UniProtKB/Swiss-Prot annotation:
HAMAP family: RimP. Keywords: Cytoplasm, Ribosome biogenesis. CDD domains: YlxS_C (cd01734). Its main location: cytoplasm. This is Ribosome maturation factor RimP. One of its GO terms (biological process) is translation. It comes from Geotalea uraniireducens (strain Rf4) (Geobacter uraniireducens). GO terms for cellular component: cytosol. It is found in: Cytoplasm. Signal peptide: none annotated.
């Protein structure tokens, strides 16, 4: 099975298992590290996840993956929290984390409300409206970033 197909199939199975445990799948990676493949899942829930949550996901998902036989080669399964710099992947994430400090990178330079073009936006997430991510930038400007132009977005930790 091609890597893209493996990722797609594992994502469906993982979302079913993880949601049944009251958590959400934040991100999934399947890549070669050294000599072996690593399937890495990042999970979260309201209030955050702990070691027992990660162990439960690992146990449950391992059983499902063994039965479904999705991955034919040897791999390691890792389950963890997304960390303090949690990625924002879904439209819902941009609403859920409204008011938090975010760093957004875009595929191409986009203007802020002062006309300054940039690819990196750092500021307070104001939400998402009609597919446009709204950010109050640290420098005082505002930015309206079309969701489809977001290459990468993460929460930023404030000291």
């Amino acid at each position: 099975m091609a890597k893209v197909d493996v990722i797609s199939r594992v994502t469906v199975l993982a979302e079913q298992v993880i949601s049944s445990l009251g958590m959400e799948l934040v991100d999934l990676e399947y890549k070669r590290e050294g000599r072996e493949m690593v399937l890495r899942l990042f999970v979260d829930k309201e209030g955050g996840v702990n070691l027992d949550d990660c162990a439960s996901v690992s146990r449950e998902l391992s059983e499902v993956l063994d039965v479904e036989d999705v991955i034919s080669e040897h791999y390691s399964l890792e389950v963890s929290s997304p960390g303090i710099d949690r990625p924002l992947k879904k439209v819902e994430d941009f609403q859920r984390f409204k008011g938090r400090l975010v760093k957004i990178r875009t595929f191409e330079p986009l203007p802020d409300d002062a006309g300054n073009k940039r690819k990196t936006f750092l500021g307070e997430l104001k939400g998402i409206e009609n597919g446009v991510v709204l950010v109050a930038l640290k420098e005082g400007q505002n930015a309206a970033i079309p969701f489809e132009k977001v290459a990468k977005a993460n929460l930023e930790f404030e000291f």
